[in-house]
From Swiss-Prot:
GO terms for cellular component: cytoplasm; ribonuclease H2 complex. Endonuclease that specifically degrades the RNA of RNA-DNA hybrids. It comes from the Bacteria. Pfam families: RNase_HII. It catalyses: Endonucleolytic cleavage to 5'-phosphomonoester. This is Ribonuclease HII. The keyword Hydrolase applies. It is found in: Cytoplasm. Its cofactor is Mn(2+); Mg(2+). Residues 15-201 form the RNase H type-2 domain.
Length: 201
């Protein structure tokens, strides 16, 4: 008895796939970032992993490789003002839309980390823990994270009293203590409950 050709019935994967991820949804300060990356299958980037498990030096080195070897990449953000007016989820989706729209080539499929994705002009697939499973999403997570970390160093230069270079805007005991001492700055997210608690107007 002839066996059916199961593989022949499967739809082929799109040729141009973008990985999409964000950085900075949880912090109390700074913009939320997103990146989109289309990797070159002929020039793979070794060592890709979820940005959260990599050391800062590893992330920076990989970011250089990704920017040099990817077919296309783009990093975008949504500002603190957009976060406060839209809410953090909508602002994150906006940053992702901007990242995909900024790519030099249009993807046929966007694979987005997590279980929520923005509306895009191409097909979209969400992937739980995609930053650890899909190389293009790992690459996007690294570019988003390194871009956001660089932005927090810029904020530290403007507002050194908050220690943004240490906690990157997250609600650490150090950050909360400095908030009590100084009150919030313009780059703190007024819509976040801890900032409201410290007297943000």
């Amino acid at each position: 008895m002839e066996q059916p050709d199961l593989f022949g019935t499967l739809a082929p994967l799109p040729a141009i796939i973008a990985g999409v991820d964000e950085a900075g949804r949880g912090p109390l300060a700074g913009a939320v970032y997103a990146a989109a990356v289309i990797l070159d299958p002929d020039r793979p980037v070794d060592g890709l992993a979820d940005s959260k498990v990599l050391k800062a030096e590893q992330r920076e080195a990989l970011a250089v490789q990704i920017r040099a070897q990817a077919l296309a990449w783009f990093v975008a953000s949504a500002s603190v003002q957009e976060i406060d007016s839209l809410n953090i989820l909508r602002a994150t989706m906006l940053a992702m839309q901007r990242a995909v729209a900024g790519l030099a080539m249009a993807p046929e499929l966007a694979m987005v980390d997590g279980n929520q994705a923005p509306k895009l002009r191409c097909a979209v697939q969400t992937v739980i823990k995609g930053d650890a499973l899909v190389p293009a999403i790992s690459a996007a997570s690294i570019l988003a994270k390194t871009a956001r970390d660089a932005d927090l160093l810029r904020l530290h230069a403007l507002y050194p009293q908050y220690g943004f270079d240490q906690h990157k805007g997250y609600g650490t005991p150090q950050h909360l203590s400095l908030l009590r001492e100084h009150g919030p700055c313009p780059e703190h997210r007024r819509s976040f409950a801890p900032i409201k608690a410290y007297g943000a107007p």
